[in-house]
Amino acid sequence: MQENPTFNHQADLVNSAIRFINSWFRQSKTITAELSNFFILPGNKVIGAEVIVARLKGIFGQSDEYVGGRYDIIDVNFELMGEEKGMGFVEGVAGFRAVLKDQSKIISGPFKLYFALQNGSWKIVNIEFPGFAY
């Protein structure tokens, strides 16, 4: 049986996106496992992952919990630039209820997670996600 590298990369991207989204819904510290050491923002601005981690902690600290998290992945795409490098994305829609004491707020919308293939592993290099802002 012949191995299909396209399927493996697509599956890796989807699985990484799912781990990120599920960690988001749980407000889990394991979310950092999916992040690259650097992020590429519009205008070719590059920032370190520690800035993103601090931002995530600040966002998670605004709510006691997230409940009812749901998502649908609509598209996955990637381009390899040699065997060890590539760029890709996973996009879809996500929603959840942010609860703080007796108040709750529904947060939903489209998401797009941008990935770079680094040392054989897909890592997130940019985040567009409901409730997240740089």
Where are these regions (language model features)?
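Short, low-complexity N-terminal intrinsically disordered segments enriched in polar/charged residues
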Residues: M1-T30, F38
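A broad structural signal for short, well-ordered beta-strand segments within beta-sheet-rich domains
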Residues: H9-L13, Y66-R70, I124
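Extracytoplasmic/secreted envelope proteins and their assembly/folding machinery
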Residues: A17-I18, T32, V53, K57
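Short, hydrophobic secondary-structure boundary micro-motifs
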Residues: T32-E34, V125-N126
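A short gly/proline-enriched turn/hairpin at secondary-structure junctions
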Residues: E34-V51, E65
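Short, solvent-exposed loop/turn segments at secondary-structure boundaries
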Residues: N44, D102-S104
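Surface-exposed, charged secondary-structure patches
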Residues: A54-D102
